[in-house]
UniProtKB/Swiss-Prot annotation:
PROSITE patterns: RIBOSOMAL_L2. Keywords: Ribonucleoprotein, Ribosomal protein, RNA-binding, rRNA-binding. Belongs to the universal ribosomal protein uL2 family. Part of the 50S ribosomal subunit. Forms a bridge to the 30S subunit in the 70S ribosome. Residues 21-59, 223-274 are annotated as: Disordered. The gene is rplB. It comes from the Bacteria. This is Large ribosomal subunit protein uL2. Residues 45-59 have a biased composition (Basic residues). The lineage of its organism: Bacteria, Pseudomonadati, Pseudomonadota, Alphaproteobacteria, Rickettsiales. GO terms for molecular function: rRNA binding; structural constituent of ribosome; transferase activity. GO terms for biological process: cytoplasmic translation. Pfam families: Ribosomal_L2 (PF00181), Ribosomal_L2_C (PF03947).
């Protein structure tokens, strides 16, 4: 889609860079594939904050996305849409055989009129869904299942992909964007291609208000707090915190390993990140 730059006619537009939405549909989302979505504001069922910096934002309708791709037959791409709930774009697919529509994550390069299909005999083309055992080594895939039939769990954000780098018995070796090489059952499904909107990472919101529209609240530095609120808080005048950077709960940040030792999925990881 490309990027959209703004002339600095106001302080907030100076330096603002957004993703261009040229080519996206301006229609309302498919009503049969939407549902209400209530914002939690980062609170749990007790009303306590479990995720900081969440709250407010524009109202959103949730788009029901087909992450399992169990429907066989050819589908026609009707339009590419913006989804406020995720960074990638959506494609509305129409199946003429049974007059059913569904949303899928749009891969890069997909456009209205394209044909997609799911099944073991599908061609190796963006948007087609196959079992990993039927996809050639070296292919880029997204929407990858971790367990057969559970639906896609890996490589779903804008610009994300995984690469098939080899096979090992009933498993496929998959290199993730982090550099990690992981064993995935070859009976899991994956979709060919790279998720759309790779320029999402290059956007600059330009003003605090645009973050608030997205439901993101301000982040306060620990050194600006009181001692009761943060390990870096307090002190006379401006201080540097007086210790190595930690979270509000005293856990070292800046590179500390957070993965649990002896995790059951360790046996499926062939190479760590990097």
């Amino acid at each position: 889609m490309g990027m959209k730059f703004f002339n600095p006619v106001t302080p907030s537009s100076r330096g603002t860079v957004l993703v261009s939405k040229v080519g996206l549909s301006k229609d309302e989302p498919e009503k049969s594939l939407t549902s209400g979505k209530k914002s939690s504001g980062g609170r749990n069922n007790h009303g306590r904050i479990t995720t900081r910096h969440r709250g407010g934002g524009h109202k959103k309708k949730y788009r029901v996305i087909d992450f399992k791709r169990n429907r066989s037959g050819q589908g026609i791409v009707e339009k590419i849409e913006y989804d406020p709930n995720r960074s990638g774009f959506l494609a509305l697919i129409s199946y003429k055989e049974d007059d059913i529509k569904s949303y899928i994550l749009a891969p890069q390069g997909m456009k209205p009129g394209d044909v997609v299909t799911a099944g073991n005999d599908a061609d190796i083309l963006p948007g087609n869904c196959l079992l990993l055992k039927h996809i050639p080594v070296g292919s880029f895939v997204h929407n990858v299942e971790l367990k057969p039939g559970n639906g896609a769990a890996i490589a779903r954000a804008a610009g994300c992909y995984a690469q098939i780098v080899g096979r090992d018995g009933q498993y496929v070796l998959l290199r993730l964007r982090s550099g990690q090489i992981r064993l995935i059952l070859s009976s899991c499904k994956a979709t060919i291609g790279v998720v759309s909107n790779p320029d999402h990472k290059n956007r600059k919101l330009g003003k605090a208000g645009r973050s608030r529209w997205l439901g993101i609240r301000p982040t306060v530095r620990g050194v600006a707090m009181n001692p009761v609120d943060h390990p870096h808080g307090g002190g006379e005048g401006k201080t540097s915190g007086g210790r190595h950077p930690v979270t509000p709960w005293g856990v070292a940040t800046k590179g500390k390993k957070t993965r649990k030792r002896n995790k059951s999925s360790d046996k499926y990881i062939k190479q760590l990140k990097g």
